[in-house]
Amino acid sequence: MFVDQVKIYVKGGDGGNGMVAFRREKYVPKGGPAGGDGGKGGDVVFKVDEGLSTLMDFRYQRHFKAARGEHGMSKNQHGRNAEDMVVKVPPGTVVIDDDTKQVIADLTEHGQEAVIAKGGRGGRGNTRFATPANPAPQLSENGEPGKERYIVLELKVLADVGLVGFPSVGKSTLLSVVSSAKPKIADYHFTTLNPNLGMVETEDGRSFVMADLPGLIEGAHEGVGLGHQFLRHIERTRVIVHVIDMSGLEGRDPYEDYVTINKELEQYNLRLTERPQIIVANKMDMPDAEENLKAFKEKLTDDYPVFPISAVTRQGLRDLLFEIADRLETTPEFPLYDEEDMAENRVMYKLEDEEAPFEISRDPDGTFVLSGAKLERLFKMTDFSRDESVKRFARQLRGMGVDDALRARGAKDGDTIRLLEFEFEFID
């Protein structure tokens, strides 16, 4: 089964917790703190595997969580970093953040990797908090939570050439006679529901990958007839081969078909019009085909080459394949996404987090609710079982201006403050 879109959940591993420990050794009085740091959590890494061709595996496993780092130990022993979770994806996979709809990674080459969810750093042990004023600190940090997000995976097939056109114009038949691909062929519309790839080789030894894409209909750019699902596979092709049925057996006007399909391509993605297009007048072995082709050329205003062929009798295929190979030699690849934009979307903590470290809202019951990525991160890294850790967290809140902001919002002694699932009293 061909699967080309799926939504999954990924989470980097949490960092290991830091340790509160002290050196206890004979003849060494007041040995001092000796708690080690926690290890880093594992990253969730996507890696391209050219042996895969579909996202089928993700239908059965939709949650990916990397291992957490090992906790710190006594004698200043640091916890081991967790191994990364490597998830294999097929070439042509686009990773999109489900919340922001921004592209995180475009994975096209075998072995290419991208960190999708970064693991948290390990918490610091009490050795890190020793100062002249507090040489034996009773506090440590919990590990930093790993990044978590819902993402959408889209598979856009990797092909040099894309066959486009209305249903039943002969795209699958054409692919089957110029390559060893065996697409399903029948005399009804939408026989092809999934892209079929075939390797084509010309007589002079040049080769390229051709994709038979499912038939399009009017309104495809708006999703009509599974249009979005089909159109996404055209985006990576360098040359578009527009197959048109010249027989007129279904009562359609070949030129109207041509105009309709090109309009759908343009409205789906304007950049598709930048690609070279070759018009294939198919089914020239049928009785009215020559007359229809003549009328088509009279109406055609675009400067695209027209190749009359018959996929069934193989008439005209040699010249067509040579033209496609020639066009590919002079046509560069069309990158779908900007590399810098994708790199920015993979960053864990952006500048915006520093500009707005917290927000304050108020529930109907009068409770003040604190939120914000930085604030929640500090909260999760605090060990509330130790008084010194709690006091440190209170100092951090004051340093961030939380106390002053609460007073400005009208908070008074005894008011309830909520942060995530934790509630505490405001003391002025």
From Swiss-Prot:
Domain Obg: 1-158
Alphabetical keyword list: Cytoplasm, GTP-binding, Hydrolase, Magnesium, Metal-binding, Nucleotide-binding
Listed EC numbers: 3.6.5.-
UniProt-annotated binding residues for Mg(2+): S172, T192
Pfam families (UniProt xref): DUF1967 (PF09269), GTP1_OBG (PF01018), MMR_HSR1 (PF01926)
Spans traversing the lipid bilayer: none
Compartments (UniProt record): Cytoplasm
Enzyme class: hydrolase
Record flagged with keyword Calcium: no
GO cellular component, one term: cytoplasm
OBG-type G domain residues: 159-329
Region (Disordered) location: 118-143
UniProt cofactor(s): Mg(2+)
Chief localization: cytoplasm
Molecular functions per Gene Ontology: GTP binding; GTPase activity; magnesium ion binding
Binding-site residues, GTP: 165-172, 190-194, 212-215, 282-285, 310-312
Listed Gene3D superfamilies: GTP-binding protein OBG, C-terminal domain, GTP1/OBG domain, P-loop containing nucleotide triphosphate hydrolases
CDD domains xref list: Obg
Residue stretches making up the OCT domain: 350-428
Function: An essential GTPase which binds GTP, GDP and possibly (p)ppGpp with moderate affinity, with high nucleotide exchange rates and a fairly low GTP hydrolysis rate. Plays a role in control of the cell cycle, stress response, ribosome biogenesis and in those bacteria that undergo differentiation, in morphogenesis control.
Family note: Belongs to the TRAFAC class OBG-HflX-like GTPase superfamily. OBG GTPase family.
Subunit-level organization: Monomer.
Protein name in UniProt: GTPase Obg
Organism: Bacillus licheniformis (strain ATCC 14580 / DSM 13 / JCM 2505 / CCUG 7422 / NBRC 12200 / NCIMB 9375 / NCTC 10341 / NRRL NRS-1264 / Gibson 46)
